[in-house]
Amino acid sequence: MTLESLNALTSSEAMKQFELCCGSSGWVRKMEKNRPFNSIKNLFQKAKSIWFSLSIDDWSEAFLHH
């Protein structure tokens, strides 16, 4: 999927795509709220900063999906 395609998705479609990347519902919601991304670098920076802002419970939720 291109960045442009990701940015053009509806909120629910984008959340489904983010769920494929991470099982934390908090991470998924925050990623969706940070759209649109202006570059791939920006997307990865947001993904990383959101991940490290999550609670231990959010991390546990993500790890349960592995």
Stretch-by-stretch model annotation:
Residues 1-10, 16, 21, 26-66:
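Aromatic-anchored, charged helix-turn/loop surface patch used as a conserved interaction hotspot
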